[in-house]
Amino acid sequence: MSDRLTMQDPRDQYPRPPFPRQPQPAPGLVARMEPQPDHGEEAYHGHARLKGRRALITGADSGIGRAVAIAYAREGADVAISYLPSEEADAREVIALIEAEGVKALSLPGDVRDEAWNATMVERTLEAFGGLDILVVNAGRQQFREDVGQVSTEDFDATLKTNLYALHWLCQAATPHLPPGAAVITTASIQAYEPSDILLDYATTKGGIVTYTKALAKQLIEKGVRVNAVAPGPFWTVLQPSGGQPQEKVEKFGAHSAFGRPGQPVEIVPVYVLLASQEASFVTGEVWGVTGGAGIA
């Protein structure tokens, strides 16, 4: 879908379920998804709203992070992306799309569950770009478990370290380097407000992200830095078929939304662009829901 400007019925703008079953091991690869998600590869057109800014985005090889990386580059920002080494194939595509915009790109393969790696990401971004103006903490782990007894300590630890500990470690490393006017954006979820029974550990972390974001916003506004969260609803990303949902739910993913379909990553990036830009100069400590009509409390 390349036309995002012409007025049209949003219910029919992108594919609707049923979708084919498409199991793949976590963390998954975009190329194996059917239908292919729209990250804005052709659809997103920038307007220099972030010209000269320097951004670090975690989990940017696929899904929402990939769409944000593409959009930021097309808005004029230099972009560093982090991802797991197993996601290199997807990451190479994102790096090529960033570089095609004539801005700097930086690859940061590693595991955010490693505390030291979070500091290293910040250091390498500062070295490559000479500073950091936008931090998007987006990397996430989602693996469904149908019973609390199936959520092992290993599961719980991996999800909390990926989704919540890494947020803290990365903010600790980055905030001393953020100038006045900088922005921190976290990815929360509708799961913070309407938790699914099969996503117990994931939903727990998303609730934590909301409260952490609001608390950090109160600290960092004293430096002139804004901090906000985005809470997505059902979005068609590789997180879902690679263990984030049972395959029977993948088949009808997004059907329960007011639109009768899941959102595409390109549909949420305008919020990330706004929150990173000076146009959101009076916005901090907020959670922006993009939930397909479900709303957030």
Predicted features and spans:
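Active-site helix of classical SDR
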Residues: 171, 205, 213
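A conserved structural motif in NAD(P)-dependent oxidoreductases
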Residues: 257-268, 279
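Catalytic Tyr-X3-Lys loop
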Residues: 149-168, 185, 209, 259
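A glycine/serine/threonine-rich, flexible loop-to-helix segment
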Residues: 198-200, 222, 234-258
